[in-house]
Amino acid sequence: MREVTLERNTNETQIELILNLDGAGRYEVDTGCGFLNHMLELFARHGRFDLVLTCHGDVEVDYHHTAEDIGIALGQAFARALGEMRGIQRYGSFYLPMDEALVLCAVDLSGRCTLNWDVHCKTEKVGDFDVECASEFWLGVARNVPATLHFVQFAGENTHHILEACFKGAGHALAAAVAIDAAHRDEIPSTKGLLV
């Protein structure tokens, strides 16, 4: 079973999480931010990952450190759960329509960090959540898997819908990338023989 328990503690955040890549989409999430909770629950549900996550952060400042550090911790958890990435599909992509919004998420578990965030929201906040914290979250994930992540928005007016499409789409794309390739279970999916 590809399951990891992880703690990450700094002066800004204290994070505990359990991630199971081969789960059923069950989640218990408490980040101190209602909107971020909602996004992570959608990510877990649509990726079919089991995720238990608590974060106590300096939310009296804002949600920047909370979002960034959860992204870092989640990326580290994926890296540990995947190990040397033997037998995985490696790539995944998904177009996610959410009402009027349409976003593509594409993933390469390449061992190299790239985030292309081509997402353009028309408001700076959803509730009290700063929209720019969404890209900080995904940059934390990308740096710590490490992985290449592309988010490309094709349509959308409502900021909530656009970000929801990003998180749901990422769940689907990552689920495809971490899926085991039964025909090549013992192989690392790279001509180099390793993913770095």
Residue ranges and their predicted role:
Residues M1-V196:
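N-terminal intrinsically disordered, cationic/polar leader segments
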